[in-house]
Amino acid sequence: MVLLCLILEGQWQQKWASLKQNMPALALTVMVAWFYLSTIWTEASKTQLEYAANTHWILLLVPAITLLIDDQRWKKRCWQGFGAGMVLLLAHIYALGFTSIPWIRSGSPSSVFFNPLSQSVGLAIFSALCISQIVGNSNRLRQLWLAILFISASYAVLSISQQRLGYLMWATACLLVLMLKLKPVHRKLGVAIALGLCLVVFMSSAKIQERFGLGIKEAQAYHFENNYTSIGSRLHMWYGSIRAISTAPVLGHGLGSYPMVAEAFFKDAAMCDVGCKHPHNQYLFYGVEFGLVGLGLFLWMLYRAMIVHRSLNQDSTMPLVVLLVMALSGLVESTLWYRGWVYLFVPLLGLSMLSPTQGDSKYPHKHDPDS
């Protein structure tokens, strides 16, 4: 509906001028155009091509968001909306400890938001958002409520969840916020204390130690021909993806081609059920389907989005957290392909591509999107 209304509204010259001023959004638009151009040489079946075509267009919501949010008030409201959504998610997570909720399909507190991994990473970002609002806030009551929300979200990530990626992104996001928000005189001490707390959490949690220990064992026990573990399957996908890239390095195998290409290096049907959908690595995924051209456009988009916030001012804190978390999560997950990740990152990516000064001339007194 958002895209349809933007199309029906017209005003193409104004929209094009706005898009050209936002280089990250323009880079993403060019990237998506390249994806669909690759249908000319794709090796995908008709079914796979249709599924891929119905997935990648959602990325166009990112430039749509940058066109629609043109003042500081709406940036602030959108971040508040994300926070409200995470509070609602936390309410469901803790309520499931006492009763069943009919509209939650899994019934598990770790899988309320479609997918356990995206849920834990989303709560990790929310934890960082809470810290960003606590630091420098003079309202003690508000600080107290934010601290309660931070503890609730952190407990959901570190104790209720069993996701290694969630643990790592929680630590990464919280540390980055402290590095960006604290004054230089307090920065080293604050980060040192935070690192110490992370170490205490790790040493005091048998579950976290067990999950990381299991990951190390799975990596050590990996065998190319037959491995069904979480880490082993990923290693197999990545190795096969690199081989697939080498056979079509520049243009790739085309839109929706990964399942067809992956069947060649997944001899076991059970492993193919897991690994023939996507390679659990956003960079290799784009490399296989869209070649070095598509991968280069993706990296260019990330780079342009990050340098928008190179001034490291207050408004850059959460966008940089989102971009770093998405970039790191993309090393082990297909963060712009799988639905659970798309629901999380597409709206946040749109917010993160907005310049810290976008809309200041219209509403200069409303300059606090992190609130």
Regions found by a protein language model. Give the residues of each.
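Transmembrane alpha-helices of multi-pass inner-membrane enzymes
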Residues: 2-6, 174, 301, 319-329, ...
